[in-house]
A protein has these predicted regions:
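A short alpha-helical cap/connector motif
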Residues: 1-105, 109-134, 138-159
């Protein structure tokens, strides 16, 4: 088995992952290892997460990163494509073919309304046996991110 934690420790680019995410990732993502999956990750940050997925899933993996920061384009390399755009731009998602990704990871703005809009727009892009993964959903409980403990507008309430 390709250990995700070991791959994380080898990263050359910046990446932040909570420790308790690793066993969850491996539980749900392991079936794609060695199967040349297509991954979409919203939110590029330092490019490390894209590198992590490319190395973890192995040869033939394609990773597409979307970020509104034009500086993220520098993380583009073989098998990693960077699209500079806002995750709430409907045209971006409607131009992509249906069922084009095995895994979609939203690690973008963490703002509840953006998470909800993104799920609604990208769901059609996920293959039937694919996975939609929204990171850092604890922000649903932050008023600053459009949520709150009992907020009907939080991503947690929506899902």
């Amino acid at each position: 088995m390709n250990n995700l934690r070991e791959q994380f420790n080898k990263l050359t680019k910046r990446c932040h992952k909570f420790e308790h995410y690793f066993p969850l990732y491996e539980t749900h993502f392991e079936r794609f290892v060695g199967k040349s999956p297509r991954i979409l990750e919203i939110g590029v940050f330092g490019g490390g997460s894209l590198e992590l997925w490319k190395n973890y899933f192995g040869p033939g993996t394609t990773v597409v990163g979307v970020d509104k920061n034009p500086h993220c384009k520098k993380y583009e390399e073989e098998d990693i494509e960077i699209i500079i755009d806002d995750q709430t731009n409907r045209e971006l998602w409607y131009d992509m073919p249906v069922e084009s990704f095995d895994i979609v990871i939203d690690d973008g703005s963490h703002i509840c309304s953006h998470q909800i809009q993104t799920l609604q727009m990208v769901y059609r892009l996920i293959k039937q046996d694919g996975i939609y993964w929204c990171e850092d959903v604890h922000t649903s409980y932050y008023n600053s991110h459009g949520g709150g403990l009992y907020s009907p507008t939080s991503f947690i309430s929506f899902t």
